[in-house]
Structure formats: structure tokens, C-alpha cells
């Protein structure tokens, strides 16, 4: 481990900058996974990170972003966070969309307006509405409608494009039905999903943003 840190000074900086987070994340993650297995939650690992709307693709973003972080500090929804290894070692500290504490406001284009390096290109609200940074993934066996036989629908209520709707399920219940093609990847559904430790609905990143 010491050899790895010696060879990678950027990682040393990350560990020094986030000592508490690094110390707590691993055991918390391990604990969550253990609890998830016990209660039947199915974990979901995202294959691709979500770069901000206007960044065109993860590759374009990684090439132009200097991790200066005005977008992170100004994000009104606190969706943009400094990345660790989501983009790989070369993208450490570059902002990534994270829906733990919020979701990307459907009409917000602030990050595209303040990026000084053209890593995030300017977007109008109308252009953002047509930009898909990621797509919705639903894990039925994690959903409380399935596990607890209770109604929910929080994800559908927060979807601005109707990519998540509720359809008849059983015993008078309704369950989410997804249409990834019209999802823009705002993360509203993932943020509000009440299931823990592993949510029933997630946003998977698009390596290249779709229009």
C-alpha cells in the first residue's frame, strides 16, 4: 500500500484531503453490503460515472476538466461531488454526479454557465431537456412494493419526463415501470427512493451523452 501511495502522489493528496471519508467509507460499505444480503437487497454497481449535462461525454470532460470546482461549490442541488476513482486515476477530483444528497434540477444550467475550461459547454434549458446523461435502471426485487406489499411511487412522482410511471402490480398495488429511452438522467428517482442500503432504482451513466 505504501508503495502505491509513493508512486501516486495524487492519491496521497486525496487521502489527506478526505481522511475521515476514506476511513469511514470502507467499513460502512462493507456493513451495508452485509445488511443488504441479510435483508435480501440486491446491490447495484454503476458501470459508468455520470458527467454533468453539457460535458458531451466522459472522455471530453476528462480531457478538459481541471477540477477547479466552481461547478461543485455553486451547484444548488449539491449533486456534483469531487470524484475518487469513478473516472479512473486520471480523473481523480473531477466532478461527478452523485444523487445521495440531491438530484439535478430539470431546468438548472448553472454548471454549464460557469465552467471556465469548456469541460461543460453552455446549454439552454431546452437543450438540457433533450440531453440524456444517463438512463434509469429498476431492480424490482429491491422495491418496497415487491418486498413489503406497500404502495410507494416516490420515483414516478419526481420524474420530469415520465420515464418512470406506476402500473398495476398485484393486490391493488402499483409498481414502477421504466422507459430508459426518455430518461434524461436527472437522478430524481434515485434520490427519493426510500430503500436502503441498496436502492431499487438507479441512474446508469452514458459514456457519451445522447440527444
What label would you give each PLM region?
Residues 1-211:
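Non-ligating segments of multi-cofactor redox enzymes
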Amino acid at each position: 500500500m505504501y508503495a502505491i501511495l509513493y508512486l501516486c502522489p495524487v492519491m496521497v493528496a486525496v487521502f489527506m484531503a478526505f481522511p475521515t471519508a476514506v476511513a469511514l467509507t470502507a467499513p460502512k460499505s462493507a456493513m451495508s453490503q452485509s445488511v443488504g444480503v441479510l435483508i435480501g437487497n440486491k446491490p447495484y454497481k454503476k458501470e459508468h460515472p455520470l458527467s454533468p449535462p453539457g460535458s458531451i461525454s466522459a472522455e471530453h470532460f476528462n480531457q478538459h476538466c481541471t477540477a477547479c470546482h466552481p461547478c461543485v461549490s455553486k451547484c444548488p442541488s449539491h449533486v456534483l461531488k469531487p470524484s475518487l476513482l469513478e473516472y479512473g486515476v486520471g480523473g481523480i477530483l473531477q466532478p461527478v454526479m452523485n444523487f445521495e444528497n440531491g438530484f439535478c434540477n430539470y431546468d438548472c444550467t448553472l454548471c454549464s454557465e460557469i465552467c471556465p475550461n469548456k469541460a461543460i459547454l453552455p446549454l439552454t434549458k431546452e437543450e438540457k431537456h433533450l440531453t440524456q446523461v444517463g438512463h434509469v435502471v429498476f431492480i424490482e426485487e429491491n422495491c418496497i412494493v415487491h418486498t413489503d406489499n406497500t404502495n410507494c411511487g416516490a420515483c414516478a412522482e419526481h420524474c420530469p419526463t415520465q420515464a418512470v410511471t406506476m402500473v398495476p402490480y398485484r393486490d391493488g398495488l402499483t409498481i414502477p415501470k421504466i422507459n430508459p429511452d426518455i430518461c434524461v438522467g436527472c437522478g430524481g428517482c434515485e434520490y427519493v427512493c426510500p430503500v436502503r442500503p441498496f436502492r431499487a432504482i438507479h441512474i446508469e451513466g452514458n459514456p457519451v451523452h445522447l440527444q
